């Protein structure tokens, strides 16, 4: 992995009691060695694999102003990280779920892009066996389950300040979002809505097929082609590019897919991240609620599965063998 660490700082937040959250600040940057490089490579890998939301700094963001000063050399990186940790402590202390953790600031470069990653990492306790087969306690950073993480694409931020996607962060847990306090700390707002972009793509595909008056099987084959391209991009960690997608798809009528979507005003970006759950709707129908969960291939609609809109009734002809076996056993036990 071609990841080059420029500067990295660690500090700590310690929860003393329900009302007190203390901060412990390092007096120096963390030396870059093999252990640090391995940790950052793992954190980068874990973060890159997770679904993220996009954002941008508010005009009055203190963190953005401090980061600009640091980038210009008016303030060193350690001072920037120490002051930011203090602001994070003040923000986090407002929330009832406040917990301590190791606060990490790392400026690094990956594939010619410069990033600043900020995270609060939890420590977990475990057991270890030494060479003498004695048992002792140990603790480690729980990187795989890190959920308080934000990353700023410094290259994008500085070259394209009008962008709505140079800041990414992880969505929080169910209920009051853990990400709320982190967004307040960053003084940032949500930017590019990836789900909306993917929904817009699906609508554009359906309208394009309808405009070309494709039959049912032709429409589904076209959706499958769109899904195949998008899924390949998703698996490769790449974005959906409308121009590349249009080149993959057969042209319907006088306009290709990109020209059609631009003229119809779907407000799609030239490229945007793929959303797995939304894209699945190209090839499947799925839903759950009221103790019922249904998932089936789109090709089965009006073939083996029929929906009566007037009565909101779904009729299934031919059940899966394992389901049929369960139903037969239950019927036989009555």
Swiss-Prot record:
It comes from the Bacteria. Keywords: Cytoplasm. The keyword Cytoplasm applies. It is found in: Cytoplasm, Nucleoid. One of its GO terms (cellular component) is cytoplasm. Disulfide bonds: none annotated. One of its GO terms (molecular function) is single-stranded RNA binding. Belongs to the YejK family. NCBIfam families: PRK00378.1. This is Nucleoid-associated protein YPK_2796. It comes from Yersinia pseudotuberculosis serotype O:3 (strain YPIII).
């Amino acid at each position: 992995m071609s990841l080059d660490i420029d500067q990295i700082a660690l500090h700590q937040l310690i929860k003393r009691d329900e009302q007190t959250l203390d901060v412990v600040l390092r007096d120096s940057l963390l030396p870059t060695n093999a252990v640090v490089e391995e940790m950052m490579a793992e954190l980068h890998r874990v973060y890159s694999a997770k679904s993220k939301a996009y954002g941008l700094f508010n005009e009055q963001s203190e963190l953005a102003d401090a980061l600009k000063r640091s980038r210009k050399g008016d303030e060193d990186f350690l001072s920037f990280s120490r002051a930011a940790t203090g602001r994070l402590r003040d923000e986090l202390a407002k929330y009832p779920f406040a917990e301590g953790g190791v606060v990490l600031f790392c400026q690094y470069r990956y594939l010619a892009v410069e990033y600043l990653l900020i995270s609060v990492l939890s420590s977990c306790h475990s057991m270890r066996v030494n060479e003498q087969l004695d048992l002792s306690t140990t603790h480690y950073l729980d990187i795989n389950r890190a959920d308080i993480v934000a990353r700023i694409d410094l290259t994008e931020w500085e070259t394209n300040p009008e962008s709505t996607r140079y800041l990414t962060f992880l969505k929080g847990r169910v209920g009051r979002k853990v990400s709320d306090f982190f967004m307040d700390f960053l003084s940032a707002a949500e930017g590019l809505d990836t789900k909306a972009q993917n929904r817009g793509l699906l609508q554009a595909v359906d309208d394009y097929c309808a405009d070309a008056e494709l039959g049912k099987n032709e429409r589904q084959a076209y959706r499958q082609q769109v899904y195949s391209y998008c899924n390949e991009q998703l698996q490769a960690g790449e974005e959906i590019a409308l121009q590349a997608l249009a080149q993959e798809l057969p042209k319907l009528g006088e306009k290709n897919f990109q020209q059609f979507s631009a003229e119809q005003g779907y407000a799609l970006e030239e490229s945007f991240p793929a959303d797995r759950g939304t894209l699945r709707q190209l090839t499947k129908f799925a839903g759950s609620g009221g103790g019922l969960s249904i998932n089936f291939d789109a090709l089965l609609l009006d073939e083996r599965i029929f929906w009566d809109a007037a009565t909101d009734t779904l009729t299934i002809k031919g059940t899966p063998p394992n389901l049929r076996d369960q139903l037969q056993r239950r019927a036989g036990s009555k």
